[in-house]
Structure formats: structure tokens, C-alpha cells
Regions:
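Cys-dependent protein tyrosine phosphatase-like superfamily
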Residues: 1-88, 102-140
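A phosphate-binding catalytic loop at a beta-strand-loop-alpha-helix junction
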Residues: 88-98
Length: 140
């Protein structure tokens, strides 16, 4: 798990047994950016969701396949960020979740700052700079 910015964290696939630890760490929301059955050994969304709800953690499912970013997922991520809840977003490696954060955060931060933050977190998205700038200019 990597802290990306303030109360937003990204991680690779989590397991049902991880949810109790997330509760202890005061996470309020888990955001799954993975479609079911992406890999054979992947726990189902329902399994993770039921553990989250049993532990009083909000659960949202915004599945994104690699390379398939859409406006709806970005806008829903923006809504999550506006709540300021301590949130863990996950996918297979954390990359898609962090990319969604990057697009959503261009509303509040300059693109260079977003790229600096993601790079510091271990995700180099320099190849997305032009796309992030275009999104920022059209969504303001």
C-alpha cells in the first residue's frame, strides 16, 4: 500500500483477511478498480465488499480494464476525493487506481504537481502529461 496524497492510498489486490487491518488503520472507504475474473486467483468483488461492510467500511466498485479510462470513473473518483475519507483504492498493481486519482486531482492541482506526487509514490505517468493537461483544460 502506498500513500498517494493526504487520505488517498493505492494498493495491489487486497484479500478479505486484509480488511480488519484496514479498519484498525481507520480506513473509511475501499475503492475497487478491478473487474471480477481479471485473474483466476483473484478474490471476488463480493467477497471484499462483504468484509468491508461487516467492518463498517464503505465499498465502491469502479472497474477499469487496463487502458480503458472513462469519464464516468474519473468523475466518481472525484466524488470520493471530495469526501476526504481515508480511502484505499486497489487494482492489480495500484497503477490504474493511481491514474484515476491523477485525472481526478487535476481539478485541484496543476498537472506538474500531480505528476510530481505520483512519481514520488512510485508511479511515473510522464507519458500521460499531455492527456492530463487536455483533461484539465476541458473539465474546468
Amino acid at each position: 500500500m502506498k500513500r498517494i496524497y493526504k487520505n488517498f492510498y493505492a494498493a495491489h489486490q487486497i484479500q478479505a483477511k486484509d480488511i480488519a487491518q484496514l479498519k484498525q488503520e481507520k480506513f473509511e472507504c475501499v475503492l475497487c478498480n478491478r473487474p471480477d475474473n481479471e485473474e483466476q486467483d483473484q478474490p471476488s468483488v463480493e467477497m471484499i465488499k462483504s468484509q468491508c461492510l461487516a467492518n463498517g467500511i464503505e465499498f465502491l466498485h469502479l472497474p477499469i480494464t487496463p487502458g480503458d479510462f472513462n469519464l464516468e470513473a474519473i468523475m466518481e473518483t472525484e466524488k470520493v476525493l471530495k469526501t476526504a475519507k481515508k480511502t484505499l483504492a486497489y487494482c492489480r498493481t495500484g497503477t490504474r487506481s493511481t491514474m484515476l486519482w491523477a485525472f481526478a486531482k487535476t481539478k485541484d492541482l496543476e498537472v506538474d504537481e500531480v505528476l510530481k506526487i505520483t512519481d514520488h509514490s512510485g508511479y511515473n505517468f510522464q507519458h500521460l502529461k499531455e492527456l492530463l493537461e487536455t483533461y484539465k483544460s476541458t473539465s474546468s
